[in-house]
Amino acid sequence: LRVEGREIISVDPDAYVIDALFFMKRNNIRRIVVSRSNNILGIFSVDEALYHIINNDVESKLKDAKLKFPVIVKSNELKEIMRSMIDNDTDAVIYDNKIITYKDVISQIDWSKSNALIGELSKEAIFVEPYTKIKTVGELMLKNKIRHMPVYGIVSSRDIVYNYDIDLNLSINKIMIVEVYSVSKEESLHTVVSTMIKRNIGSVIVTNSKNIEIVTLKDLVTFALSNLIY
C-alpha cells in the first residue's frame, strides 16, 4: 500500500516569515517548503511559525529562520513512510517532489483491522484556563512540543499562527475553539479516526473519570506502526 501525498507548496528563502504566515493563513495550510531551484532548505511549519511569533521575530527572512530539517524518503510504501516519520520525529516527509503528512498516512490505514478502544491510546493532556495569555499558551506548546491544548474548549498552534497579528497578552479564549470533538475512552478507535478524517481535525479529547486526556495524529501513526495496522 502506497501513500500518494500532495504537491509541494514552496516559497523562496528570501521571503520573510511574516509573508509565510500570511500565506499559510490565506491558504489554510500548516507547512511550506522553503526551496530555491529545486534545492530544499527546510520546512516552515506551524511549529516554527509559533516559535517566531512568540519570540516576536516575524521580520526575519526564511533563510535565517528556524526550519525543520527536510526528511526525503526513497519509498512511498505506507509502512516505510510511518517508520520514517516516527524515527525522525516529523509530521511530514518528501517523496518524488510531493509531501506526505500524518493526515495522508492516517487516511490510508485500514483502521477496521483494529479492535482497540481510543482510551488505549490517550494520554493526560496539558490544559490551561480560558484567561491564560496567548503568549503563555504558545510558550507551553513550544516547551512541551505539543500542538493542541484543552481550554474548556481547545486551542491549537495553528489557531495562534493564523492570528499572528493579535496581541499576545490577550486571553486564549479570544481564539480558542469552543466546540470540541470529545469521546468516551470506551469509543472504538475505528469510529474515532473515521470522524477525525471526516472533520479534518488533528486531535480528540478523551473523557474519563479522573483526567482530561488527548489523542493526536502522531499517537495514531505510532499506534498503527507498533500494532502492524496498515
Label every model-predicted segment.
Residues 1-7, 43-71, 76-88, 95-127, ...:
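Tandem CBS (Bateman) regulatory domains
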Residues 1-41, 119, 228-230:
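Hydrophobic, helix-prone linear segments
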